[in-house]
């Protein structure tokens, strides 16, 4: 247990500390020289720290504006979104977290050795999504085995979804050999992919392509990321009831984020490149040409201007949905600052088409409101159990746009707290059918298309 205490201490330090350590170990395992391994690990660590600083700056600018917008719009709902950090704290504070972490690591390694996944995740921090599912199952059933199985099942789903989403990462974000095994980044794809397929077949509609290049072409300097950040920031400021000076200040902050994020992403890729190249050489030799994918935090995707633009435009859209959706009690708040993570893969799916990304994200987020409302009592009780009760506003319940608010994690949770003899075979049967369809029908076509 002493070893796990050390591990948990590193985890508590956050991904900025964890990532360079994991990257260094990863580089050494792939026989990169110690000097190059240290250089790559520190470069990746510095880039990730830079990304986090800019994202935190974005969140601190957007958070007060969002709160003011809620007040200005007169929205009154009794379930508040406390953000992914609160839900992550519940997951990492579970009494059975050592067993769940081992199960997630073991599942990843077993699937790799059995050639059932190509994703090798170094993004240990985002285990918290699976840990949260397992924790909620444990609190509901008081059964350690079932809870650990729920976490492992969530991990299996994530690793396979990361495999299937990897062409989007390599093609749109130009990050070959990388994927994103984070369920909050992948979650909207099961809803967005079939709807996007339908959109491709609607005459006229399928010709609308409103992307960053279109903005630059038709709007000149006003289509540049800096100006888009300024305009969107000022617009959000006015919707929040800010005076012109405050609104302009918010606009400057959004413009700064739009400019700095791509630079940090470029530095991240620069640090990762030697490891990716060495990993490719080793895996080509040891695994007979298998392409092992490095699973990273979705922060590496946030350097794309279309992602930030889509995320900023989704803020008032989600607040509007909170008001008009019948039966909803969830008020989006803290996780609005994390929207870039949640929209990034949809933006890649549409190849940067902001118009289509907004429609797909709007549709995909609708279930979140109902699931967040339904699971709020459970999330509130779990937060109180692990000692987070003081953070809950008086007279309110808490939820988030992560945890069991996401459709797949909600389904896994319900399966493992239900009649296991019925629910688990149904879940696995459906999943393996999807697995077969994706591996035999979809992915070969994607690989053929990408090779042309």
What function would you assign to each model-found segment?
Residues 1-54, 95-293, 305, 347-356, ...:
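Signature of multi-pass transmembrane helix bundles
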Residues 40, 47-98:
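Membrane helical hairpin/interfacial module
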Residues 56-63, 139-142, 297-299, 371-386:
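Hydrophobic alpha-helical transmembrane segments in multi-pass integral membrane proteins
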Residues 57-61, 75-76, 94-95, 161-163, ...:
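Hydrophobic transmembrane alpha-helix bundles
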Residues 60, 84, 259, 263, ...:
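A short glycine-/small-residue-rich loop at the edge of a beta-strand within enzyme catalytic domains
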Residues 63-81, 276-297:
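Membrane-interface interhelical connector segments
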Residues 75-83, 100-101, 283-291, 306-314, ...:
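A broadly tuned preference for mixed-charge, low-complexity surface segments
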Residues 113-117, 295-381:
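Hydrophobic alpha-helical bundle architecture
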């Amino acid at each position: 247990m002493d070893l796990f205490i050390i591990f948990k201490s590193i985890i508590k330090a956050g991904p900025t500390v964890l990532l360079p350590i994991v990257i260094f170990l990863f580089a050494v395992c792939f026989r990169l020289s110690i000097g190059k391994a240290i250089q790559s690990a520190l470069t990746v660590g510095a880039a990730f720290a830079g990304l986090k600083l800019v994202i935190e700056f974005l969140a601190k600018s957007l958070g007060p504006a969002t709160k003011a917008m809620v007040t200005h719009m007169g929205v009154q709902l009794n379930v508040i979104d406390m953000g992914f950090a609160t839900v992550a704290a519940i997951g990492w504070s579970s009494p059975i977290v050592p067993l769940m972490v081992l199960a997630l690591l073991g599942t990843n390694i077993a699937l790799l050795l059995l050639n059932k996944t190509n994703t090798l995740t170094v993004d240990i921090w985002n285990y918290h999504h699976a840990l949260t599912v397992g924790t909620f199952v444990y609190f509901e059933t008081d059964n350690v085995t079932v809870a650990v199985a729920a976490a492992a099942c969530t991990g299996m789903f994530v690793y396979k979804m990361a495999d299937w989403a990897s062409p989007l990462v390599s093609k749109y974000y130009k990050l070959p050999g990388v994927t994103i095994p984070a369920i909050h980044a992948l979650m909207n794809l099961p809803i967005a992919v079939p709807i996007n397929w339908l959109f491709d077949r609607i005459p006229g509609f399928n010709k609308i392509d409103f992307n960053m290049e279109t903005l630059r072409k038709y709007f000149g300097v006003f289509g540049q990321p800096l100006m888009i950040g300024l305009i969107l920031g000022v617009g959000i400021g006015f919707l929040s009831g800010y005076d012109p000076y405050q609104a302009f200040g918010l606009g400057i902050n959004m413009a700064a984020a739009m400019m700095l994020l791509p630079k940090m992403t470029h530095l991240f890729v620069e640090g990762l490149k030697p490891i990716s190249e060495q990993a490719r050489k080793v895996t080509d030799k040891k695994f007979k040409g298998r392409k092992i994918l490095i699973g990273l935090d979705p922060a590496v995707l946030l350097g794309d201007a279309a992602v930030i633009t889509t995320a900023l435009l989704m803020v008032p859209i989600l607040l509007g949905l909170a008001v008009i959706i019948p039966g909803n009690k969830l008020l989006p708040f803290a996780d609005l600052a994390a929207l870039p993570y949640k929209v990034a893969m949809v933006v890649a799916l549409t190849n940067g088409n902001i118009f289509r990304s907004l429609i797909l994200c709007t549709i995909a987020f609708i279930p979140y409101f109902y699931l967040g409302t339904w699971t709020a009592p459970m999330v509130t009780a779990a937060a109180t159990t692990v000692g987070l009760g003081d953070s809950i506003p008086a007279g309110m319940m808490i939820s988030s746009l992560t945890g069991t608010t996401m459709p797949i994690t909600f389904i896994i949770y319900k399966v493992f707290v239900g009649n296991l003899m019925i629910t688990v075979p149904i879940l696995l049967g459906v999943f393996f059918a999807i697995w077969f369809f994706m591996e035999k029908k979809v992915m070969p076509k994607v690989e053929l298309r990408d090779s042309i």
